[in-house]
Amino acid sequence: MLRYDERKLNNLTLSSFSKSGVSSDTRLYIAKENTDKAYVAPEKFSSKVLTWLGKMPLFKNTEVVQKHTENIRVQNQKILQTFLQALTEKYGEKAVNNALYMSSINMNKPLTQRLVVQITECVKGADGGFINLIKNKDNVGVMNAALVIKGGDTKVTEQNNDVGAESKQPLLDIALKGLKRTIPQLEQMDGNSLRENFQEMASGNGPLRSLMTNLQSLNKIPEAKQLNDYVTTLKNIQIGADRFSQWGTCGGEVERWIDKASTHELTQAVKKIHVIAKELKNVTAELEKIKAGASMPQTMSGPTLGLARFAVSSIPINQQTQVKLSDGMPVPVNTLTFDGKPVALAGSCPKNTPDALEAHMKMLLEKECSCLVVLTSEDQMQAKQLPAYFRGSYTFGEVHTNSQKVSSASQGGAIDQYNMQLSCGEKRYTIPVLHVKNWPDHQPLPSTDQLEYLADRVKNSNQNGAPGRSSSDKHLPMIHCLGGVGRTGTMAAALVLKDNPHSNLEQVRADFRNSRNNRMLEDASQFVQLKAMQAQLLMTTAS
């Protein structure tokens, strides 16, 4: 039986922060911290003197004063976090999160009894709902908010969604602590414990409820957009009857589904939760860096859930253009764009695992790709034992395939063509497959004519009337080599040139790098061949 009790940081409770006979504006700190005898104490007279000296130009740069200033900063941070933890123990994470979001109280000030009362009153109001928080006359710092009453439901809409700078670090700390507490609990979950303990997990301080509450903190900090987008992708993954974001609530579709689900269905649900928990460790790592002084990430690779052949440190996957299945599952594939228009789907060779191949096939089926272009040579496939998933008949999870060779040709780079029939449930789709058997890694094709011929073959693969270009990630060619950066980028750029020979190849490369990663079109010899193809096309156009 799993336990979800959170271990307290120490023995301090809310009552520990109330000190009779002490001025309400005296700075508080934790004495004998990290021991069983820790207690909240008022600042000593000697400390006050050093703090006063730190305000005087003559003394503020002395070693003893500077050391004291740093100690005070650390003390202030520790007691604030301990106080917020005590508040969370009493009122719950949601109330504390909401209070920090709505309140404009300066969290960078030293903790005093006056500040303790102000923050506690905000949390009490938040515990009773946003309306109480706004109506509370003792709440001295509520951001501009508008009440919207619709159909009997009262909601609060923020006129200013940005939180104050002083509230950002506490919100990030809450998210970090929540993740560090809940991830191990999610990793221990199994199908039986999920069925038996779901109500406990999805209420109070249970791991599912706490996780969803803590992750909301990131949505309140504009600078944390990359982190928030990452967790939003994970929360949108379908598990059982609903998206993962709904698994932190009792009494809904998720709970009803769990009651009726088979042992196999629960096992599959837990498997997805485990891979999501593993991905959330990446968020934890980023939050740890921010806590240590790093800036907010400006870019982040999207979650791969174990489906990617290469680590994102080697082959990044831009999460803003990452392709997602209908059930919200992200796949390690990007939509390449040029001049704002989609050109192709691009990825690495699928990882040789059942889950990765099933996701890859579902993507081809759901996106109704105009064709599949495999640029890994026959020699490379054998040397690296890459899956020849596009020829023969296979079953990958829910997807069944049956591929028939249509033609072989030495012209245009030894292209084999297949028609691959895909089926998943009632959905059926047949996709043309072009396998280029003699394109060496990190090198150009044997001739520029072969590159142009291949581009023509791809453009002419127009399955079921699907257009070669689209305004979305549907009906596009899916292209991959081994890593999905060199040959794949070259092939996609050749398609752009066939559309418009006057296209700026440097801009094509820049747009592809923005679309997927900075390694796109990284091989100089392949880029030289693209320029030769462009010159050839321009001469033909001129004549």
UniProtKB/Swiss-Prot annotation:
What keywords are annotated for this sequence in UniProt? GTPase activation, Host cytoplasm, Hydrolase, Protein phosphatase, Secreted, Virulence
Question: What positions are marked as the site Arginine finger?
Answer: 209
Q: Keyword check for Secreted, yes or no.
A: yes
Instruction: List locations, semicolon-separated.
Output: Secreted; Host cytoplasm
For the keyword Metal-binding, the answer is no
Tell me the segments the record calls region Chaperone-binding. Answer: 35-139
Which residues does the UniProt record annotate as the domain Bacterial Rho-GAP? 162-293
Domain spans labelled Tyrosine-protein phosphatase = 315-543
Catalytic site: 481 (phosphocysteine intermediate)
Stored Pfam families: SicP-binding (PF09119), Y_phosphatase (PF00102), YopE (PF03545)
Grouped into one coarse class, the protein's main location is secreted
Question: What SMART domains does the annotation carry?
Answer: PTPc, PTPc_motif
Q: What does this protein do?
A: Effector proteins function to alter host cell physiology and promote bacterial survival in host tissues. This protein includes tyrosine phosphatase and GTPase activating protein (GAP) activities. After bacterial internalization, GAP mediates the reversal of the cytoskeletal changes induced by SopE. This function is independent of its tyrosine phosphatase activity, which remains unclear.
Query: What's the protein name?
Result: Secreted effector protein SptP
Organism of origin = Salmonella typhi
Q: Which gene encodes it?
A: sptP
